Amino acid sequence: MTEFKHETVLLKEATAALAVKPAGIYVDATLGRGGHTRQILNQLTTGRLIAFDQDEAAIATVTADFGTLPKQLTLVHRNFRDLTDALTTLGITEVDGILYDLGVSSPQFDDSKRGFSYRFDAPLDMRMDQRQTLDAKTIVNEWPYADLVRIFSRYGEEHFSKQIARRIEQARTVQPITTTFQLVELIKAGIPAKARRTGGHPAKKVFQAIRIAVNDELSALESSLEQALKLINVGGRISVITFQSLEDRLVKTMFKEVSSVQDVPRGLPVIPASAQPNYRLVNRKPILPSEEELAVNHRAHSAKLRVIEKIHD
């Protein structure tokens, strides 16, 4: 098995924000290579940790690394949008904290066979869950022009969505687009030369957009956070690390909605209890990686940590 290096981002900050209780029940919604999982486990005595990942490779790698799983740890090979169902199956209806480390892990990016990266020539795949049928090849070759424009614009915030989608539409009538490098060349051809020279790799935004569409990432995140807000006990916290603006905007909006005072008539001397929010923002502004972390882990640059706490039912 190929070894892939993975540095867990905001390791101490994200777990410290959970304020772990030794006897509590916690969820790591994104197991990855187990960095946050181990950090939480180290603080548990009689408590319990359930770690989710839809990527079979992540489950297998962490299982092998542990050898024998600690009795406090349960691994669940499911998407975190199945949070409530999976926990109910385990007899759990309330938890003390939930952690999310969103996006693609370094091993997924660095495994050329997975097709997540524009740096390697590989089959167009991008599935986090290898059990699903929809992959990047299907989207690129079969989705209508209008749908390609929509996802490139909405999920990639790509200014040249129409031009790139048109190049793809024309090319696939000649032969199927099956590899990442084929797609990269079409993306480059759809972006004016001057624009290609700025803003990083020209394929970055479109690859992000296709990956989000393949894995239905934003819908899964919204659904999972809605469940998480209901699952946590009073005093429990949700800790979320995001790596791009779409995720961060969604988390920020959802957290703001549930932590804000409901509409009440002006001039009331006291806000009634019924209008008080059930949650509070632990950090008004996102927590960012330290200079020390940025110096050793370049993939931490875009990371933001947001934390919310349930203060009453």
UniProtKB/Swiss-Prot annotation:
<dbReference type="InterPro" id="IPR002903">
    <property type="entry name" value="RsmH"/>
</dbReference>
<keyword id="KW-0808">Transferase</keyword>
<dbReference type="GO" id="GO:0071424">
    <property type="term" value="F:rRNA (cytosine-N4-)-methyltransferase activity"/>
</dbReference>
<feature type="binding site">
    <location>
        <begin position="34"/>
        <end position="36"/>
    </location>
    <ligand>
        <name>S-adenosyl-L-methionine</name>
    </ligand>
</feature>
<protein>
    <recommendedName>
        <fullName>Ribosomal RNA small subunit methyltransferase H</fullName>
        <ecNumber>2.1.1.199</ecNumber>
    </recommendedName>
</protein>
<feature type="binding site">
    <location>
        <position position="80"/>
    </location>
    <ligand>
        <name>S-adenosyl-L-methionine</name>
    </ligand>
</feature>
<dbReference type="InterPro" id="IPR023397">
    <property type="entry name" value="SAM-dep_MeTrfase_MraW_recog"/>
</dbReference>
<dbReference type="GO" id="GO:0005737">
    <property type="term" value="C:cytoplasm"/>
</dbReference>
<feature type="binding site">
    <location>
        <position position="108"/>
    </location>
    <ligand>
        <name>S-adenosyl-L-methionine</name>
    </ligand>
</feature>
<keyword id="KW-0949">S-adenosyl-L-methionine</keyword>
<dbReference type="Pfam" id="PF01795">
    <property type="entry name" value="Methyltransf_5"/>
</dbReference>
<dbReference type="GO" id="GO:0070475">
    <property type="term" value="P:rRNA base methylation"/>
</dbReference>
<comment type="similarity">
    <text>Belongs to the methyltransferase superfamily. RsmH family.</text>
</comment>
<keyword id="KW-0963">Cytoplasm</keyword>
<keyword id="KW-0698">rRNA processing</keyword>
<feature type="binding site">
    <location>
        <position position="53"/>
    </location>
    <ligand>
        <name>S-adenosyl-L-methionine</name>
    </ligand>
</feature>
<comment type="function">
    <text>Specifically methylates the N4 position of cytidine in position 1402 (C1402) of 16S rRNA.</text>
</comment>
<feature type="binding site">
    <location>
        <position position="101"/>
    </location>
    <ligand>
        <name>S-adenosyl-L-methionine</name>
    </ligand>
</feature>
<dbReference type="InterPro" id="IPR029063">
    <property type="entry name" value="SAM-dependent_MTases_sf"/>
</dbReference>
<keyword id="KW-0489">Methyltransferase</keyword>
